Amino acid sequence: IRGFGIKDVNDLVCWNKYLLETYGKDHKILMYGKEQGANTILNASGRHVLKNVEAIISDGAYTSPYDIIGYRLEADYKISKYPAISIIARHIKKAVRIDLKENTTKYVRHNDIPTLYFHAKDDDFVPLKMVYPLYNKNRGEKVLFVLKDEKYLYELVENDDFKQTLSQFIKKYMK
């Protein structure tokens, strides 16, 4: 996927339509996305183009491509994001017609699909601080769970808080 979660919305809508045409329009869908995939789902949810989607699980979403690329420039290459991000943004806009400043918070303001946001406290790709504007601007029902670390997700035990949160969320919205 090379649409930064923006152009990918059209692909997601096609998959959504395909699922309903193939398996029947009475099916309920839970969508899960990680990082860019989460942004794709969140961007689509605010446009009201998803059908039969009862719930969303967003894992490590970012506020905008502009923000995450700027962050990665500083974290990975130790260079100031300015003016590099401006040059990159202009090039991408010209080459593939994507505005990197397209902000997912603009779409979640209109999201009415229940959404579980989770993010690892020590996420080394998308910083934790990016989940808060998304969660705070989300109009619909929402839950936020901050994982103590990424590995924690794969070591779930029976009495685990996240496992319980996830289970309760799915049971509530996927009846």
Q: Which stretches of residues belong to each language-model region?
A:
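Short alpha-helix in the alpha/beta-hydrolase fold that links the catalytic acid
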Residues: 113, 127-136
